């Protein structure tokens, strides 16, 4: 007759810490050709800025060379950059949108 041993089930609980996603700044860069009204329109359409916020950001871009439109997780930031750059080209403006790690 064989011996049966007690089988212990040991569950190791591994706690994985959820890290917040890396965030990225979406930047609009100044140029000498894109009309200020178009920049305001971009900020309102793609970044949901009201007229005053859009105007303030546009003036920052105009005076400082670039301005932050928003801070987003990478996937969202990348999508916004692509959308803005496509919209600018479709409207024949050289406006450049880019991203930087926040």
From Swiss-Prot:
Top-rank taxon of the source lineage equals Bacteria
Organism of derivation: Shewanella oneidensis (strain ATCC 700550 / JCM 31522 / CIP 106686 / LMG 19005 / NCIMB 14063 / MR-1)
Cite the Pfam families for this sequence: ClpS
Give the family this protein belongs to, as stated in its UniProt record.
Belongs to the ClpS family.
- Cite a single GO BP annotation: proteolysis
HAMAP family tied to this protein: ClpS (MF_00302)
Where, by residue number, does the polypeptide cross the bilayer? none
According to UniProt, the name of this protein is ATP-dependent Clp protease adapter protein ClpS
- Give the gene name: clpS
Q: Write out the function statement from the record.
A: Involved in the modulation of the specificity of the ClpAP-mediated ATP-dependent protein degradation.
The chain's disulfide connectivity reads none
Under PANTHER family, the record lists:
ATP-DEPENDENT CLP PROTEASE ADAPTER PROTEIN CLPS, ATP-DEPENDENT CLP PROTEASE ADAPTER PROTEIN CLPS1, CHLOROPLASTIC
Q: How does it assemble?
A: Binds to the N-terminal domain of the chaperone ClpA.
Taxonomic lineage from the root: Bacteria, Pseudomonadati, Pseudomonadota, Gammaproteobacteria, Alteromonadales
Against InterPro entries, the record matches this protein to: ClpS (IPR022935), ClpS_core (IPR003769), Ribosomal_bL12_C/ClpS-like (IPR014719)
